[in-house]
Amino acid sequence: MIKLFNTLSKRIEVFKPIDDVVKIYCCGVTVYDLCHLGHARSYIAWDVLRRFLIYSDFKVKYVQNFTDIDDKILKRAKEESISMKEVSEKNIIEFHKDMDSLGIMRPDSMPRATNHICNICDLITILEDKGYAYSRDGDVYYSVFKNQNYGKLSNQNIEEQNINQQGRMANEENSKKLNPQDFALWKKAKDDEPFFDSPWGKGRPGWHIECSAMVKDELGDTIDIHLGGSDLIFPHHENEIAQSEAANGKKLANYWLHNGMVNVNGQKMSKSLKNFKTIRELINSGISPMTLRYFVMTVNYRKPLDFTEEALRSASEAWKNINVALSFMDLTKGSLNSIDKNEPIEEEYKEKISFELSQKKLKFSEALGNDLNTASAIAIIYDLAKPLKNFLNQFQRVEGFKIDQNEKFFLLENFKTLEKLTEVLGLKKEVLVKESKITEEEISTLINERLKAKKEKNYAKADEIRSLLKEKGIELIDQSKEITTWIRV
């Protein structure tokens, strides 16, 4: 049984699919820049959901869009003196690099807004015909007050909003609206902007209608699960519901799941606070992709994730132990990869081990089935890794170390279970780095020398110190010009 917290009902519900194939839509990125830690948090959570559904014998169709026309993309195109399409294409390539590095499965379909203009126009026309939309001088707006259910996802009170927003109709766009809360379905093109032809003239779609059109075209009128960050609940997802359900006359999604936001040292991650972390920066700073993935999964997907040096270091150490266990067959050089048929295993012992491992698999499924409790699932993974790592410590220390067939059976079955369950979490074996014997005091001394070299603009020496520490298994993370932290890898 899988239970999920449904933002729509505000409670945990047992998941019941509509039919044989679970239809999932996830709001994708606006492709104007590199992905950040918030994107990693979101897409890792939904990757675990997808993997767990497949592990639980569900068939899944997973769709995630690209928003490839937007004010931010147009702004970036002007800044770089390239076309909107070039900005989008470049960042879609970088998106795939980041997601692939984190072990995130590629969606079954990744539609782009610009390829769905006809569907978008058709949907807007239906809304006009049904009286939910109106046009004003080349723009088209959704009339929020025509929809009595508006606000059901976010608990927004549009009557109160209307009172609060009275007098804010000064700018040109708002002056065209019947009410301040009405939102754009189609925007009239400005002189210097790319455009698409439509029944209302040259222009481009609003952000919200893009997703409604792509959901309908890719998955149909009603889907099982709609995913996104909690920052999308209002207005984006609220507006999606309003558009789709008004046009189609059916419920858009049965389950709405939203992940929590990312903080850095207790503060909201933002460019203005200069604590903004891209996935690429974090990996280039020495944090391994699987360490990052493991770190994200240590906290329930609905809760805020606080990125701190201490939490990251703890995740790095924990993942290192699991990674060693996943390297079990490599480190034993295949010497334990089979059971000696001439020395049979006690049947009673085999049954005991098989039962114990089946119980761990059951608890693993119960953990993830309890609203994706990845922290509890990881605890089971760690429990499986522990005897493998303990054995390896003895095996590598004692020459000619031998074990009986019972223990060999236990270790091999434990390893197989570990491999299978880590795959559900998307954790994959990474190349092992020899552990360093350098002390924390020595590391601090070298970091201070490097900071001094950087202040003196002696970048060659600074790079030399970074390389020296890297050779000793220490990766430096530059938090700012004055602050450098480190992790063992």
Curated annotation (Swiss-Prot):
Q: What is its EC number?
A: 6.1.1.16
Q: Does the keyword DNA damage apply?
A: no
- Indicate the transmembrane segments per the record: none
Give the signal peptide range. none
Q: Where is this motif: 'HIGH' region?
A: 29-39
Q: What class of enzyme is it?
A: ligase
- Which coarse location class applies to the principal site listed for this UniProt protein? cytoplasm
Q: Name one GO biological process term.
A: cysteinyl-tRNA aminoacylation
Tree of life domain: Bacteria
Where can the motif 'KMSKS' region be found? 268-272
Q: Quick one: which residues bind ATP?
A: K271
What does the UniProt entry say about where the protein is found? Cytoplasm
- Which of this chain's residues are annotated to bind Zn(2+)? C27, C211, H236, E240
GO terms for cellular component? cytosol
Self-association and partners: Monomer.
Tell me which family the UniProt entry assigns to this protein.
Belongs to the class-I aminoacyl-tRNA synthetase family.
PANTHER family attached here? CYSTEINE--TRNA LIGASE, CYTOPLASMIC (PTHR10890:SF3), CYSTEINYL-TRNA SYNTHETASE (PTHR10890)
Protein name per the record: Cysteine--tRNA ligase
Instruction: Record the organism.
Output: Prochlorococcus marinus (strain MIT 9301)
